[in-house]
Amino acid sequence: MLNKRGVPCRCESDGPPRQNNALSGTTFYVVGCNKAGWNKCRYINAISTCCKEG
């Protein structure tokens, strides 16, 4: 089962893509944002979700 996380991703609150934009989210694969204190901040695709702590 895939449960990898740790790849940075862009949340909706990060604004439009620009060079040197901070990526405040973390990609969760398969399991979604299932950790306490993590919230979905952007849909990526069927097997990964961008989540933000807090």
Swiss-Prot record:
Q: Give residues where Glutamic acid 1-amide occurs.
A: E53
Listed Gene3D superfamilies: Anthopleurin-A
Localization, per the record, is: Secreted; Nematocyst
> What InterPro entries would the database entry show?
Myo_ane_neurotoxin_sf (IPR023355)
What is the annotated signal peptide range for this record?
Answer: 1-7
Cite a single GO MF annotation.
toxin activity
- What name does UniProt use for this protein? Toxin AnmTx Cj 1c-1
Physiological role = In vivo, induces marked paralysis on shrimps (C.multidentata) at 10-20 seconds after injection and a weak toxicity when injected into insect larvae (M.domestica).
List UniProt keywords, sorted A-Z. Answer: Amidation, Disulfide bond, Nematocyst, Neurotoxin, Secreted, Signal, Toxin
Similarity comment: family membership: Belongs to the sea anemone sodium channel inhibitory toxin family. Type I subfamily.
Q: Where are the transmembrane segments?
A: none
Which cystines does this chain contain?
A: C9-C50, C11-C41, C33-C51
Domain of life of the source: Eukaryota
